[in-house]
Each structure stands twice: as structure tokens, then as C-alpha cells.
A protein has these predicted regions:
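A glycine-rich, hydrophobic loop/mini-helix early in the fold
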Residues: 39-101
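Internal catalytic-core helix/loop-beta-alpha segment
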Residues: 93-122
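Short, extreme N-terminal leader segments that mark the start of a protein/domain
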Residues: 1-32
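Conserved catalytic core of nucleotide polymerization and phosphodiester-bond processing enzymes
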Residues: 31-34, 47-48
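Short, flexible, solvent-exposed loop/turn segments with mixed acidic/basic and small polar residues
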Residues: 12-19, 55-60, 112-116
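Hydrophobic/aromatic-rich, well-ordered segments within soluble, folded domains that form packed cores
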Residues: 120-147
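Non-catalytic, substrate/partner-engaging modules appended to enzymatic cores
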Residues: 93, 115, 136, 148-163
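Long, compositionally biased
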Residues: 151-192
Length: 192
């Protein structure tokens, strides 16, 4: 069953629109690839001035399922330029661009891994703004032994993680309420 693109974007990416997270990801199902391409183009035009980008990271025309990535360019650039994140991605097999703030080649590599590898690339967590220690903890523990589970599995201070998850969940609740009452996404998206 196809769901409304905009509603799914709010449900999964409200904290990105509110500038609380650098990026979010959602699965969107549609049999109309051309319509999806138009929507992505349109949202890039409408949200670009707020520092937001929308792109399809993975798509399957057979199943009509797509992974749509919504991100704040400046925040993503900052996250992926951190030396410890670059070292982690290098250890995970990514070829690092010469310029530490050039994130585009890293997104292309992530997209390739999503499309072509049998194993899910759990390093995607850093591309979504999860703390590096949570991403590493998830990989090293195969998703077990976490201290707290909310928007993702946390491996650090459970109280801090719960507070952060509560903030993200509250944002999503408020944004959904505003969106359903008629506030357009363009007004919900804050400038970076």
C-alpha cells in the first residue's frame, strides 16, 4: 500500500527538519518512479534554501521500494569531516575523499553498499547522526548488549540516550500534529 510521501517524511525525518539531527532515512513504496523523481526534485527546490537535501539512496523497480535520505548538508559535512568518523569509515572500507568536508563520494559509496552488498551497512548510523560510539557498539556487539533502545540502540549513558530519544520523539509528535493541522513542510523546516 502506497503512503503519502510527505507524511512519511514528517514521521521519519521531523528531527532533521527541526535541525535536531543531521539526517534521516525512510522507506517509501511507489510504483511510479517518475513521480518519486519529481517529488525529490521538488522537495530539493523547496527545502534547499533551508539547507536541506533529499535523495534516493536505494531503489528497486521490481519491489517498488526506495530508501529516501533527507539531510542537512552543513551538519552532515561536519559529522563526516570528524577525524574519528573518517578513521571509522576508512576501517569499514570506504575510500576517503581528499577534502575532509567532501561528503558526496561517501554518500555514493553508502548508496552502492545499500544496493549491492548482501549485508546491511550498519555504518549508516554515522550518516544518520547517531553517536559514533553507538554505531561502533552496535557493530561490535551485533546489536546486542545495548544500554538503551529508542530511536536506535545506544551503548553509552542510558539516561542521556533516553533524554535525547524523548526530545526526538517529542519533535516528531509536534511536527505531525502541526502537519496534520495544515502547516506546510516548508514552514516546519527551520533554516540551518
Amino acid at each position: 500500500m502506497e503512503r503519502n510521501f510527505e507524511t512519511v517524511m514528517i514521521e521519519q525525518c521531523a528531527p532533521v527538519l527541526a535541525s535536531l539531527k543531521p539526517a534521516g532515512l525512510f522507506r517509501y513504496e511507489t510504483s511510479d518512479c517518475a513521480d518519486l523523481a519529481r517529488r525529490v526534485r521538488s522537495w530539493n527546490e523547496q527545502l534547499g534554501e533551508k539547507g536541506l537535501c533529499v535523495r534516493v539512496l536505494k531503489g528497486c523497480v521490481r519491489t517498488h521500494r526506495y530508501l529516501v535520505y533527507v539531510y542537512r548538508e552543513s551538519k552532515l559535512r561536519t559529522v563526516l569531516a570528524q577525524p574519528q568518523v573518517r578513521d571509522f569509515l576508512c576501517r569499514e572500507g570506504y575510500t576517503l575523499p581528499e577534502q575532509s568536508d567532501d561528503y558526496a563520494p561517501l554518500l555514493r559509496q553508502l548508496s552502492r553498499r545499500l544496493c549491492c552488498e548482501a549485508d546491511f551497512p550498519h555504518e549508516i548510523g554515522v550518516f544518520l547522526g547517531y553517536p559514533l560510539y553507538d554505531v561502533v557498539g552496535f557493530i561490535e556487539n551485533a546489536g546486542r548488549n545495548f544500554t538503551c533502545c529508542g530511536c536506535w540502540k545506544a551503548y553509552g549513558d542510558p539516561s542521556a540516550a533516553q533524554r535525547h530519544f524523548a526530545q526526538l520523539n517529542k519533535c516528531t509528535t509536534v511536527y505531525l500534529r502541526l502537519f496534520r493541522s495544515g502547516t506546510p513542510i516548508q514552514r516546519l523546516a527551520v533554516a540551518a
